[in-house]
A protein has these predicted regions:
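Zinc-dependent deaminase
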Residues: 1-21, 90-153
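A short helix-loop-beta-strand connector motif used in the catalytic cores of GNAT acetyltransferases and
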Residues: 23-27
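Short beta-strand scaffold segments in enzyme catalytic cores
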Residues: 29-37
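Short secondary-structure boundary/capping segments
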Residues: 31, 69-70, 112
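A short, polar/charged loop-to-alpha-helix boundary motif
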Residues: 46-60
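Local cysteine-cluster metal-coordination motifs and their immediate loop/turn environment
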Residues: 55, 78-98
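Mobile, glycine- and charge-enriched loop segments
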Residues: 58-82
Length: 153
């Protein structure tokens, strides 16, 4: 499936989540779980805010969606401002989410090939807002960024 106006609309929800996370002093990565053309839940990276090792944007969106049946996930798309890391990719695969729309993968290349290997449709938008948001954050807070992606300073 190609990029649609709907993809841009739902990526905007993830971007708003990312901005919210940054305004809270956190890392500007956001996500939205969309089912049947409606936002089921949004989320943003809350590792700093919650002192958490696992509250990335995608996992926070899944948490905010609450318990769902497998049939709901089977009809969903995960929108995320940044290419999903291995942990978030694992959650996407666990719940068999069939489609992931990524804002950008220039500042961080996640496990996109693993998603594709498991039959997930991956769409990368290379959105300028997502790229600039991450570049600005990484320049301002390199240590926090390295912590988030499991890298040494």
């Amino acid at each position: 499936m190609s990029t649609t106006d709907e993809d841009k609309k739902f990526l905007a929800v993830a971007i708003a989540e990312a901005r919210q996370g940054r305004s809270e002093g956190g890392i500007p990565i956001g996500a939205a779980l969309v089912v049947d053309g409606k936002v089921l839940a949004g989320g943003h990276n809350r590792r700093v805010q919650h002192g958490s090792a696992i509250h990335h944007g995608e996992t926070n969106a899944l948490e905010n969606a609450g318990r769902q049946s497998a049939s709901v996930y089977a009809r969903s798309t995960m929108y995320t401002t940044l290419s999903p890391c291995h942990m978030c990719t694992g959650a996407i695969l666990l719940y068999k989410i069939p489609r992931v729309v990524i804002g950008e993968n220039q500042t961080f290349m996640g496990a996109e090939e693993l998603l594709r290997l498991h039959g997930v449709e991956v769409v990368v938008l290379n959105d300028d807002t997502c790229v600039s948001m991450m570049k600005e954050f990484i320049a301002a807070e390199p240590s926090l960024w390295n912590e988030d992606i499991g890298e040494h300073d």
